[in-house]
Swiss-Prot record:
The chain crosses the membrane at residues 8-28, 64-84, 143-163, 183-203, 271-291, 312-332, 359-379, 407-427, 507-527, 569-589. Glycans are attached at N292. It comes from Emericella nidulans (strain FGSC A4 / ATCC 38163 / CBS 112.46 / NRRL 194 / M139). It holds the Pfam family DIE2_ALG10. InterPro entries: Alg10. Pathway: Protein modification; protein glycosylation. It catalyses: an alpha-D-Glc-(1->3)-alpha-D-Glc-(1->3)-alpha-D-Man-(1->2)-alpha-D-Man-(1->2)-alpha-D-Man-(1->3)-[alpha-D-Man-(1->2)-alpha-D-Man-(1->3)-[alpha-D-Man-(1->2)-alpha-D-Man-(1->6)]-alpha-D-Man-(1->6)]-beta-D-Man-(1->4)-beta-D-GlcNAc-(1->4)-alpha-D-GlcNAc-diphospho-di-trans,poly-cis-dolichol + a di-trans,poly-cis-dolichyl beta-D-glucosyl phosphate = a alpha-D-Glc-(1->2)-alpha-D-Glc-(1->3)-alpha-D-Glc-(1->3)-alpha-D-Man-(1->2)-alpha-D-Man-(1->2)-alpha-D-Man-(1->3)-[alpha-D-Man-(1->2)-alpha-D-Man-(1->3)-[alpha-D-Man-(1->2)-alpha-D-Man-(1->6)]-alpha-D-Man-(1->6)]-beta-D-Man-(1->4)-beta-D-GlcNAc-(1->4)-alpha-D-GlcNAc-diphospho-di-trans,poly-cis-dolichol + a di-trans,poly-cis-dolichyl phosphate + H(+). This is Dol-P-Glc:Glc(2)Man(9)GlcNAc(2)-PP-Dol alpha-1,2-glucosyltransferase. Keywords: Endoplasmic reticulum, Glycoprotein, Glycosyltransferase, Membrane, Transferase, Transmembrane, Transmembrane helix. It is a multi-pass membrane protein. It comes from the Eukaryota. The keyword Transport does not apply. Its EC number is 2.4.1.256. Dol-P-Glc:Glc(2)Man(9)GlcNAc(2)-PP-Dol alpha-1,2-glucosyltransferase that operates in the biosynthetic pathway of dolichol-linked oligosaccharides, the glycan precursors employed in protein asparagine (N)-glycosylation. The assembly of dolichol-linked oligosaccharides begins on the cytosolic side of the endoplasmic reticulum membrane and finishes in its lumen. The sequential addition of sugars to dolichol pyrophosphate produces dolichol-linked oligosaccharides containing fourteen sugars, including two GlcNAcs, nine mannoses and three glucoses.
């Protein structure tokens, strides 16, 4: 990622990445041209922002359920522009949409790049004109995110402030971190709650959980045992059981959770100290809920909290639909026998990692999914009452095509979950290196000396008599034996660095991500693709980069371009797929309008 491109084509591609972000203002311009008036939720957001612009701070539309962060951001941006340019004096829909598009095209990519470089522990050495990576461009082109970047919705800014808080939280973990970084993180964590209430689960649970895991990794060794009792006992010795995702079975997730709890109890003071900033943010949110009487702001009767576990089933086909280009190569390496795997796709994974879900996993997870579908399929009245949303058509197929369709869909949920979680651990990381060989400190027994060795000794003695001083100097330069204890300490240091550098490939990260995702989704009765933007972005940020195929790992200069194409093919395929989806959904929105019989003359439009 940081290497300088070796070909003109690679250099051109690198500089072309930022220009891809111009699609965002182009999309917004098209929306303004065809839909100049507020559409759908904009009918609530835009008048509220205009009220704030008129300094009517106490006016609030009860149909709005999210906090006022979006309107405050637009007020600050437009006030600054007014100060510099003398306009705009009135905030019309295009002006407000422009503040959202600017955040999506300028601020969000820059902060995403910082987060990506930090997560992957890489320095950004790209030249200024090519500062953004292909991965960041693809995240910004993610269809639900891209679509709402041209409208006046809360999604872009809700994501932006979470990413910015994450950057500061990651900077707190550096050895030279200062109290200022913690203070800034606290401010950003609270600000994140002003844009969307469910951000609390990302700035407190997700960030806090990862911080605890990082803290525990610094003070622990690997637990070599796989026995549950031994794993729990090993916690008192600061040994953590946390395997790589591709080496883990379903039982390993339970063992890792138990090991984390055991080690955390053994380091309780350190864990509590590391959680203080997140607990402060959580307490602030709790104070808001007590003051407001509810989590939502406006019409509470339409947005009451409920236990909607089925949300954690819908997420998997959603991820697979958008990210299948990134899953093709991993799935080929895992599923296909080695003799059937094309050489340009073979990334050298051992046979132990080329396996399907175990029968035990199937027998445990599938019945749970079936039970969730049977007892917890919640259909919000808005879902089947509004045919402008794509979710309307998905649920109509699930519920109305056949009584057993929703149960058969559990196979899709299961396979999707397996693919998405497996991709999280799809990394070339192997087991920790073995101990270095110890230099002998004793000579071999005399009986073991061969005739050749005796002849060699005689020759050395003659050379010694001829040039004693020179031989003495050579002998004095021989390396001294290394203490085995030093070698053991060195190996443990390597293992610890490996755990820290590849934390996203381990079971502990998946557990924390799943917990934050579940908490942010299962309390919402309404199924909205927009609600899954932050879970997807966090998954995408932490997705390990694709390893180089074995055939190209020692490629000659003539094959260098071919190797780069092979490595980056999933990224290019992802770009093409996102552009195709954006063109289709954008065209449907702009050109595929229709009318409702109950509202003649008013154009209805398809959207996420």
């Amino acid at each position: 990622m940081n290497a300088q491109p070796r070909s003109a084509l690679a250099l051109a591609a690198r500089y072309a990445v930022p220009f891809g972000l111009l699609l965002i203002p182009i999309w917004m311009t098209q929306v303004n041209s065809v839909v100049p008036e507020p559409y759908l939720d904009e009918a609530f957001h835009i008048p509220q922002a205009q009220a704030y612009w008129s300094h009517q701070w106490t006016q609030w539309d009860p149909k709005i359920t999210t906090p006022p962060g979006l309107y405050l951001f637009s007020y600050a941006v437009c006030a600054l522009i007014l100060l510099l340019r003398g306009s705009p004096e009135h905030l019309d829909p295009p002006a407000l949409r422009a503040t959202n598009a600017a955040a999506a095209a300028v601020l969000l990519p820059l902060r995403l790049q910082t987060a990506l470089d930090t997560v992957r522990k890489q320095r950004n050495t790209r030249p200024s004109g090519a500062w953004l990576s292909h991965t960041v461009l693809n995240i910004c082109l993610f269809p639900p995110l891209f679509f709402f970047s041209g409208l006046y919705y809360t999604d872009v800014l809700a994501l932006l402030v979470v990413i910015e808080a994450y950057n500061w939280d990651l900077s707190r973990g550096r050895p030279n971190a200062v109290k200022l970084e913690t203070a800034v993180f606290l401010v950003l964590g609270v600000l994140a709650l002003l844009f969307r209430q469910t951000n609390i689960f990302w700035v407190s649970v997700f960030f806090g959980g990862l911080q605890v895991v990082r803290r525990l990794r610094r003070v622990t060794k690997n637990c070599e045992s796989t026995n549950v009792a031994d794993i729990l006992a090993a916690g008192s010795r600061n040994e953590l059981y946390d395997p790589l995702v591709l080496d883990a079975s379903l039982v390993d997730y339970v063992k890792t959770a138990a090991s984390l709890c055991s080690v955390a109890l053994n380091n309780l003071g350190s864990v509590i100290t590391s959680l203080v900033p997140y607990l402060i943010i959580l307490a602030t949110f709790g104070g808001f809920v007590l003051w407001n009487g509810s989590v939502v702001m406006g019409h509470k009767e339409f947005h009451t909290a409920s236990l909607h576990i089925a949300q954690m089933l819908y997420i998997w086909p959603y991820f697979v639909f958008f990210s299948w280009p990134l899953l093709l190569v991993p799935m080929a390496n895992i599923v296909l026998p080695k003799f059937m795997l094309p050489k340009f796709l073979n990334q050298g994974f051992p046979a132990s990692r080329r396996r399907l879900p175990s029968l035990l996993t199937v027998l445990i997870i599938l019945p749970i999914m079936l039970a969730v579908v049977h007892f917890n399929t919640i259909v919000h009245p808005f879902t089947l009452a509004d045919n402008r949303h794509y979710v309307f058509y998905v649920f109509r197929i699930l519920l109305n095509s056949h009584p057993y369709t929703r149960y058969v869909a559990t196979l899709v949920y299961f396979l999707g979950a397996w693919m998405i979680i497996s991709a999280m651990g799809y990394s070339p990381v192997t087991a920790a290196p073995g101990l270095a060989s110890v230099v002998r400190t004793q000579a071999p027994p005399a009986s073991a000396t061969s005739a050749e060795e005796r002849t060699e000794k005689t020759q050395k003695l003659e050379r010694k008599q001829k040039g004693f001083k020179k031989s003495a100097q050579v002998a004095s330069s021989a390396p001294a034996p290394i203490d085995p204890k030093v070698l053991a300490d060195l190996q443990e240091h390597i293992r610890r660095r490996q755990r820290l550098e590849h934390e996203t490939s381990r079971v502990s990260f998946v557990l924390v991500w799943l917990a934050a995702t579940a908490l942010s989704l299962i309390s919402a009765p309404l199924v909205e693709p927009r609600y899954l933007i932050i879970p997807w972005v966090m998954w995408r940020l932490h997705l390990p980069p694709s390893p180089t195929p074995v055939i190209y790992r020692r490629a000659s200069d003539e094959k260098d371009l071919e190797a780069r194409i092979a490595v980056n093919f999933p990224l290019f395929l992802e770009t093409v797929w996102f552009l195709l989806v954006n063109v289709i959904t954008g065209t449907l929105f702009l050109r595929g309008g229709f009318e409702w019989p109950q509202e003649p003359g008013k154009v209805q439009r398809f959207l996420w």
